[in-house]
Amino acid sequence: MGERTTSLLGKQQTYDPEARILIGTNSKIGTGFDHPKLDTLLAAADMVSYYIQFIGRIMRRKDVEPIIFDLVDSHPILRQHWIKRKKVYENHGGEIIKYNPRQE
């Protein structure tokens, strides 16, 4: 049996609060959002301000070791954005583990 998943997209106003996996947009899970079970983040946003919010949400729990998957683009401008996000992770005590499936 797998993990319970839920989503919060578009015009949706509710989601399954018992789910450990939540798929949502920045506008839905941004400022003011709270989901206590959240311990993993797959981030596809590009703005550093979103990452500061997201990191705060998953790193506040002391009973889990949070995981953030950050999708990094090779485009020069987006690569610069990654460098800024990387600094945010490092400033919050995060450990960065690089994964490149092309190198396996």
Swiss-Prot record:
Query: What domain of life is recorded for the organism?
Result: Viruses
The record ties this protein, via InterPro entries, to: P-loop_NTPase
Q: What name appears for this protein in its UniProt entry? A: Uncharacterized protein 108L
Species whose genome carries this gene: Invertebrate iridescent virus 3
